[in-house]
């Protein structure tokens, strides 16, 4: 889906950023799985970790999920190899966010995880850019769209936790 979005919106992205996104590789846990995406075979990379070592790759976009396994290896390797990383991986950021941020800072690359926080509301960018003069080290609280949805529906709709959780899961 992300691939199709980038392909479809190249001109819009260029007009906003003056950058033409060029997808060099695509990888997945299972390359044999049938997909509705129309991705050319030549773009499929069997071992996604190879992309972290290639000079022509500037940004790694991780959408695998989970805090361990290949997702963890991919993000750590990418940052260590001076690649910018974009991820929506809540579990990885929750468990290793501090470590990843230190590696990114050390290697002068960006670690972008806005989509993993607060249901995609641009809170991270607002804090980093809008509150730059303030000395904010950590933020504690529920900054997660699913949790916010559950708590809101429990309050507004008077649902029990279990029912609210099931409703949230059914909505994705």
Mark where each language-model region is.
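N-terminal glycine-/serine-/threonine-rich beta1-alpha1-beta2 phosphate-ribose binding loop
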Residues: 1-81
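Rossmann-fold NAD(P)-binding glycine/threonine-rich loop
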Residues: 66-81, 88-129
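Core active-site phosphate/anionic-ligand binding loop and the adjoining beta-turn-alpha structural block
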Residues: 97-98, 110-172
């Amino acid at each position: 889906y992300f691939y199709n979005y980038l392909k479809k919106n190249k001109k819009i992205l260029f007009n906003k950023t003056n950058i033409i996104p060029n997808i060099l590789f695509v990888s997945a846990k299972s390359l044999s799985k049938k997909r509705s995406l129309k991705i050319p075979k030549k773009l499929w990379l069997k071992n996604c970790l190879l992309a972290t070592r290639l000079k022509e790759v500037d940004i790694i976009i991780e959408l695998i999920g989970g805090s361990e396994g290949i997702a963890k290896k991919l993000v750590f390797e990418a940052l260590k190899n001076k690649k910018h990383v974009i991820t929506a991986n809540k579990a990885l950021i929750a468990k290793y966010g501090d470590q990843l941020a230190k590696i990114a800072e050390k290697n002068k690359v960006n670690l972008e995880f806005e989509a993993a926080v607060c249901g995609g509301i641009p809170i991270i960018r607002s804090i980093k850019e809008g509150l730059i003069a303030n000395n904010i080290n950590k933020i504690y609280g529920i900054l997660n769209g699913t949790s916010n949805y559950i708590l809101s529906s429990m309050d507004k709709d008077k649902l029990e936790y279990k029912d609210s959780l099931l409703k949230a899961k059914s909505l994705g």
